[in-house]
Amino acid sequence: MQVSVETLEGLERKVTVSVPTEKVEEEVSSRLRNLARKVKIDGFRPGKVPFNVVKSRFSDSVREEVAREMVQSTLYEALQKNELVPAGYPHVEPLEIEPGKDFKYTAVFEVMPVFEIVELNQAPVELIQSEVTDKDVDNMIEKLREQNKEWHEVTHAVKKGDKVVIDFQGFLDDKPFQGGSAEGYELVIGSGSMIPGFEDGIVGGKIDKPFDIKVSFPEDYGHKDLAGKEATFKITIKKIMEGKLPALDEAFAEKFNIKEGGIESLKKDIRENMARELERRVNMMNREKLFDSLMSVNHVELPIALIDKEIEHLKHDMYHRLFGHEHKDDEKIPDFPRELFEEQAKRRVHLGLLFAEYVKKHEIVADNDKVNAMIDKFASAYESPDELRAWYQSSKEHMAEVEALVMEDMVADKIAEDAKLKYKNMDYDSVMNPKKGTEKKGELACQAIQIILSVMQAD
């Protein structure tokens, strides 16, 4: 067997394999003889079919079978000998075997990048630290009161804080636009859930007295056809409701399963939950900062095949989040634009390659004590912690998920050892509800929803 390897563009390689005709013919003849012993053909007794008849009828199909199997065996051998690790499925051609000629084929594929990890070497990395304050707890209590308002209908003009039920229709240049209308839509004025100016334009409105408002979509709005454009909305208020905040008493505390201790017990419970979530978020953000720092000093060429595969995973994840179930074979997945997922896919592939190499270099293995400690930590947030522990321990897949999280923490800790750390204090709200750096994620989600709605309406 002869093998040649040609470097194409980037990580792409072209492997040419040539198998001697003698080996091919020997394998084809062997299979035809074996077939002759058991094949049934009208006019001949089983096992008595002349070889030439078998060869005439089955030679082409047997050669195709031999070609497929030879590609599998010889390509694997060629990759092993040349230390090539494909990043995706090879594109192989041709697969035909011509009688009397060497079997020659080519395989084109991307290889996994070969690189050495560059350490941070005391490069500065800014991490964050935060804690839950009394003010944070009080703010959370007020949010819970807002969420538990008792609403009653009123007849006065709309004011900020009221809840309205509206019908509306949006127009661009006097023409209705897709996704710009709704009936019986509930909206709390001042919630900021609509585009700027929309909610303010409803203030002062009255029941069953239609009016128009003009608003402009933000320049960075997710739907490109609407971004930066001025729209007119025709609005009719069907109902106005005023909210009354519940009193801070034992009855309020009981709504959150507080049996004893009233509001003070509720505050304690809220503080513990907030602290747990804050710790989780801070750890996640710091881990991401450490990973980003490692990525910034390790520029790796990324295989397109891996990026494409990750994009497909992200598409299915998006489908699951929006429709609440996994994609089924008979269901149509909307044709999401590639750019919706490309940046995130590239980051995942980059980080995955670095992670694997870093673990190998530093011989990092998931510590059993840390795995069990993480399971205990998860379990502590549940009413029946033993059941959750049993669930994780019931399958290798569940345990593997925890082991992967532990490995991430161990890698992050190792990166931190090699960095010059400094800390920035952030308040609870800034950590849990970041205002900057999330616009793009929100825009992507908005685009996805708009696309899906368009597809569903088109169908």
UniProtKB/Swiss-Prot annotation:
TM ranges: none
A GO MF term: protein folding chaperone
InterPro entries assigned: PPIase_dom_sf, PPIase_FKBP_dom, Trig_fac, Trigger_fac_C, Trigger_fac_C_sf, Trigger_fac_ribosome-bd_bac, Trigger_fac_ribosome-bd_sf, Trigger_fact/SurA_dom_sf
Keyword terms, alphabetized: Cell cycle, Cell division, Chaperone, Cytoplasm, Isomerase, Rotamase
Domain PPIase FKBP-type as annotated: residue spans: 161-246
Keyword presence, Chloroplast: no
GO cellular component terms given for this protein: cytoplasm
Source taxon at top rank: Bacteria
UniProt key word Cell division: yes
E.C. number: 5.2.1.8
GO biological process, one term: protein unfolding
Catalytic activity: [protein]-peptidylproline (omega=180) = [protein]-peptidylproline (omega=0)
Location(s), subcellular: Cytoplasm
Domain notes: Consists of 3 domains; the N-terminus binds the ribosome, the middle domain has PPIase activity, while the C-terminus has intrinsic chaperone activity on its own.
Family to which the UniProt record says this protein belongs: Belongs to the FKBP-type PPIase family. Tig subfamily.
HAMAP family: Trigger_factor_Tig
Function: Involved in protein export. Acts as a chaperone by maintaining the newly synthesized protein in an open conformation. Functions as a peptidyl-prolyl cis-trans isomerase.
Name of the molecule in the record: Trigger factor
Organism: Legionella pneumophila (strain Corby)
